[in-house]
Amino acid sequence: NLCVVTNEGERFQFFPEGSIKEAQAMNNIHMVDVSDPTHPTLIAEFPYPEVPEDFPYPNFNVMNLGCQGPFGPHNLHEPMSNKPWLEQRGDRVYCCYFAAGLRIYDVSDPYYIKELAYFSPPNPNKKPEDSFFPGLPGPRNAMTEDCCVDDRGYIYVTCFDDGFYVLKRTGAADN
């Protein structure tokens, strides 16, 4: 009776005369109790992604002011009962979070959700003028797009600029 709900990653709006700088407050993932479908109840917020130590911005929410690439939840691994080759764990959520990379969460306690691990691909080695979105300011950032997890624990991640990664959980994220 629980449902994971995302707000698609928001983006700053850029126009020929400049950008509109606006808050991106809704880049969240939520746990919602839907045991009564007429009264869904928010029971938890997923942890907001932390930036790595060497990240050039104080948080992911403001990075769009100086570089290309949105931030926010984009795609979740969605196991389906009729697909036995996909991981069917109910205690994990995998989310491609655009510029924040792939995030893996432990939802075994739906009221206290913990981030277990993350993967951030390297930034693409391309010039801003080679962008899919010409005219946007700053360097390009890696953006994870979609993810899927098979029954062996392999995580398949697509990225906007540089292709496809096959990852394997290890350590605490594998438990």
Segments predicted by a language model, with ranges:
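Feature marking well-ordered beta-strand scaffolds used for ligand recognition
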Residues: 1-175
